[in-house]
Amino acid sequence: MANSFINKKVDLTTTDLTTLYTVPSFKAAVVKSLLVSEDAGSGSTITVTLVNSSGAIFNLFKDKSIGSKATTELLTNPLVMEESEILKVQAADANELHVIASILEIQPREVTT
């Protein structure tokens, strides 16, 4: 199978930077949705970063507010990721946020001559 839909989920039980998804070798990925829900009733913030294959860090969302008992879709357009890139998330408060990413993994076709 060349392409497959997957999802990755994390319960942010700490305030540590947490890997949500890493693009596998020889693949690309399109993140179609990035949902964040707050379940503690107090509201929180989330930071989302993309780390490229060279280790450079790019902030996608910095201290994005998530309302009390709310679910927020962070992406307004798909996010294209390349091989070995990493999507990381970090909560301002432990045990308040859940994150779900819906992803299309793409296996490039082999070209023969």
Regions found by a protein language model. Give the residues of each.
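C-terminal interaction-tip segments
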Residues: 1-29, 33, 90-113
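Short beta-strand segments
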Residues: 19, 44, 58-62, 72, ...
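Short solvent-exposed strand-capping/beta-turn motif centered on an Asx-Ser/Thr pair
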Residues: 36-41, 92
